[in-house]
């Protein structure tokens, strides 16, 4: 009988751990966007990105900034952001994707939407609602 017990143990193999899933670019954007009150997807050499970051800092808001050119998966994220923002045309015809801003985990949009919200007065309430601005 010992032989039978040893044989059973020899053939027992625990189930292998499932292979980790690679997070899709859109899922990663959504996850990163939900981790902070204000999230800016940017390119470090982009003047429009710099302007939107300065706008927030000037208001006393310190956004979490994800520099796509410094991220190994930055190109994938940029394509995902283009889909989310609605830029679907050919690369030569489409406007620059960055900066893309999320406030309270919700997509605000690119620079044009952020500046429009700032000018019409709707940006401050969004920031307060997200907990990024207290005054």
Swiss-Prot record:
Name the UniProt record assigns to this protein: Glutaredoxin-C3
Keyword presence, Transport: yes
Annotated motif Responsive for interaction with TGA factors, positions: 132-135
UniProt keyword Nucleus present: yes
Family: Belongs to the glutaredoxin family. CC-type subfamily.
Entry function: Has a glutathione-disulfide oxidoreductase activity in the presence of NADPH and glutathione reductase. Reduces low molecular weight disulfides and proteins.
Residue ranges constituting the Glutaredoxin domain according to the UniProt record: 26-134
Subcellular location: Cytoplasm; Nucleus
Disulfide bridge map: 46-49
UniProt entry keywords in alphabetical sequence: Cytoplasm, Disulfide bond, Electron transport, Nucleus, Redox-active center, Transport
Family matches, as PROSITE patterns: GLUTAREDOXIN_2 (PS51354)
Pfam families: Glutaredoxin (PF00462)
A GO cellular component annotation in the UniProt record: cytoplasm
């Amino acid at each position: 009988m010992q032989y039978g017990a040893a044989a059973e143990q020899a053939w027992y193999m625990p189930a292998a751990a499932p292979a980790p899933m690679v997070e899709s670019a859109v899922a990663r954007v959504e996850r990163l966007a939900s981790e902070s009150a204000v999230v800016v997807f940017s390119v470090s050499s982009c003047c429009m990105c710099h302007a939107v970051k300065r706008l927030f800092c000037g208001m006393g808001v310190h956004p979490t900034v994800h520099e796509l050119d410094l991220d190994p998966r930055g190109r994938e994220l940029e394509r995902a952001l283009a889909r989310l923002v609605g830029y679907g045309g050919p690369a030569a015809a489409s406007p620059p994707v960055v900066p893309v801003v999320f406030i309270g985990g919700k997509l605000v949009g690119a620079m044009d939407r952020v500046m429009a919200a700032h000018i019409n007065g709707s940006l401050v309430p969004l920031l307060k609602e997200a907990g990024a601005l207290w005054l």
